[in-house]
Amino acid sequence: MAPKRKLSDSDAPEVVHPSRQVQVYGDEPKPAKKRKSEPAFNKKQAHASSVNTIKKKIRDITRKLERAQDLPADVRVEDERALAAYQQELASAEAEKIRQKMIKKYHMVRFFERQKATRQLKKLRKRLLDSESTEEVEQLKDEMHILEVDLNYTQYHPLSETYISLYPPKGSGEDAEVKATKEKPPMWKEVEKCMEEGTLDRLRNRKPEATVSTTKPVRLPERKLVKPKSIPKPKPVEQAPAIDTTGMNRRQRRAQRGVKDSRATKIAKNKSTGFSKNQAFGAVEGARADEAQDGNVSDGGFFEE
C-alpha cells in the first residue's frame, strides 16, 4: 500500500481552480470587506412603536422635577438634559410614524404612475431613434425631459409629505385632456432642480417643514423656594377682674367664681334618680292594690257591718 502524500508535496495552485484561488487562505490573507455606511439623512429613525415608551420616560422625569423641590443641582441638570434628549427622540419617532403612514397611503398611486411614465419614456426613445428631422428630434428631447422628471417625481417625491398625482384618472376625453395640460405640482420643479444638483436622495428623505405634533409641549417646572414654617405666637389670655370675696364662705366664693358645686350636683342627681325609681315603684304598687280591691268578695266575716 502506497504511503499518503504530505500536504507540502501537493501543489495548491494546481489543485484549486483559478476562479476560487482568491478564497484560499495562503501567505497573503484575504482583505476584509469594508462595510458601507449609510448617509446620515438616509438612516432609519426610531421605530413608531417606541413612542409610548418615550412618552412614559418624559412623564416620569417631569413628575420627578415637579415634586422633588430639594434635588441637588447636578442631579437636576442631568434630569433636564435627559428630558431634552427624550423630547428630541420623541419628535424623531413621531416623524417616522408619519413617514410610514404616508408611504402606505400613496404606495399604489406612485407605483402605477411610475409604470406609466416608464412606458411612455420607452415609446419616445423608439421614436427618437426612428426620427430623421431635426425639429422632431428637438421636440422629442423636450418631451423626454418632461417624462424623466415625471419618473423621478414618482420615485423621489418626499415620503413624509402628501403626494399629488401627475396623471388624471380615466374619464371623458375632454376632462383628461384638460387635466393633462394643466400645470405640474409645485414639487415637480423641485425635483427638476434636484436632478441638476444630484440631490434626489436627500429630497426623498427630507423631513416635513411643519408637522402637527399630537403631544402637548412639556414645560419645565419652576423651582420654588421653600419658606421656613413660622411658629404661631400664643394668644394673650384675658384675665377676669378680681372679685372681693371678703365675708363669704367657701360655697359662696365658688358660686361667685362660676365653679359648679359637684356635691350639690351629685345630690340633685341622686334625688332625681331616687324619685324616678320611687315613682315607678308606687305606680306598680297602686295598680296591685286596685286589682286586690276589685277582687275582694265578702264572705260574711266577723268585721263586716
Curated annotation (Swiss-Prot):
Residues 49-155 form a coiled coil. InterPro entries: Efg1, EFG1_rRNA-proc. It holds the Pfam family Efg1. Residues 199-209 have a biased composition (Basic and acidic residues). Belongs to the EFG1 family. Disulfide bonds: none annotated. It is found in: Nucleus, Nucleolus. GO terms for biological process: maturation of SSU-rRNA from tricistronic rRNA transcript (SSU-rRNA, 5.8S rRNA, LSU-rRNA). Keywords: Coiled coil, Nucleus, rRNA processing. GO terms for cellular component: nucleolus; preribosome, small subunit precursor. Involved in rRNA processing. This is rRNA-processing protein efg1. Residues 270-279 have a biased composition (Polar residues). Residues 1-52, 199-305 are annotated as: Disordered.
